Amino acid sequence: MIMKRLLFLVSVCSLCMVGNSQNYQPEKHAVVKSDRGDGRLLSTYAIVHEMLKDTHPQYAYRSGMSAQEFTQWQDGVRAAMVEIMKFPEIKRQPSPVCVKTEKKEGYILEKWEFYPFPKSVSTFLVLKPEHLKGAVPGVLCIPGSGRTKEGLVGEPGICDKLTEDYNNPKVSMALNMVKEGYVAVAVDNAAAGEASDLECYDKGWNYDYDVVSRFLLELGWSWLGYTSYLDMQVLNWMKAQSYIRKDRIVISGFSLGTEPMMVLGVLDKDIYAFVYNDFLCQTQERAVVMTKPDKENRRPFPNSIRHLIPG
């Protein structure tokens, strides 16, 4: 008798679940809205989505600003960027050191080490025209997601699994620059390339940016703040080189690399120009309109955790 009752209850629950599943139509939930007459929202997602929609950034660009207002706006954006990037003040670290020089056809390839934190080392690559006479413009090249400084200079990766299609001119940004007579400097993004962890053994270019980003968020910092801080050290090194024109330093970024590129462009007035190789969008608007559930019945979010900045 007990078993029959259990089977009956299971059957009823199953029918209810099937009924609910059959009644669910994802397209009807593509736009976030209230089912109540008073317009109030019950879903936590819907509530925080409404908060985001009603957020008005303090330094959002306003068309029609006067020259004076525009200058004040620039200064405000720069001050806010300093605050949210949270660059540490670390002193008494060793100066960068050239650890390898290799002559190539028409240019010189150098590998440099620098020491941004105690107990840390990072690297960058420099391409210099072979017959360099006097100072020339310099270009700081930043790779996109899953890419490396080695690919930018047209060289194999530090291991087979991190080797890209480096002979492709759409990949070898820095190599293209030195062929035009510029000094090109290439860096890795945080947690990628030579700065990655275990990827050489298994995942290859599918870098685990997220775990590093989580650690940094726990520290009150961010992936972008960390990456931009390292890139700023390299930029400052470039300014100190006699063969690079300080008044003609350009930053060029691919995809993910456009983010630290924009940070440096805001913070450093000496940057002459930057080359933005990515799509453009209004980030807040993108987050507001991307609400349609995906095939796993989850609402999407436009950016991964590596793009998040506290504050």
List PLM regions with ranges:
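Bacterial Sec-dependent N-terminal signal peptides
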Residues: 1-27, 31-35
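Mobile cap/lid helix-loop segments that gate and shape the active-site cleft of serine hydrolases
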Residues: 210-211, 217-218, 226, 272-311
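Glycine-rich nucleophile elbow surrounding the catalytic serine of serine-hydrolase chemistry
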Residues: 253-263
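Residue in the alpha/beta-hydrolase core beta-strand immediately N-terminal to the catalytic nucleophile
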Residues: 140, 248-250, 273
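Cap/lid segment of the alpha/beta-hydrolase catalytic domain
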Residues: 134, 141-229, 239, 286-289
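Alpha/beta-hydrolase fold nucleophile elbow
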Residues: 243-255
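N-terminal targeting or regulatory segments adjacent to alpha/beta-hydrolase or S9 domains
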Residues: 21-108
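Glycine-rich active-site/cofactor-binding loop and its immediate structural neighborhood
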Residues: 101-159
